[in-house]
Amino acid sequence: MARRSRRSRKLKLVSLEKSDKYPYKFTACFDKPNGRTSCTHFGHRDYEDYTIHGDRERRDRYIDRHAKDLRTRNPIRAGFLSMFILWNKPTVTGSLRDFRRRLRDNNWSLPT
């Protein structure tokens, strides 16, 4: 089997699981272009997010308050993961699908 060159490798979300580490909700694991795996814990178990409460106005306030977290341009960071998985779509499944698309296209505009 031929190996892909380093240039053709991209960051890839490998798994999203409930976190076993308190106080986090989820753990996202990524395969990085250098061949290493990186896991990030994010979300707080004791607090609601958009996938739980479904309040659009509350979601918009969260996005306004946390837009600065996206300045890092690093989708592995907890702020990115919270914004695009917990506060993006009404379901985690829908948000995860959108996050994978954004990761593929490198499109990090604010959720609408």
How would you label these PLM feature ranges?
Residues 1-112:
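Extended terminal accessory/targeting regions
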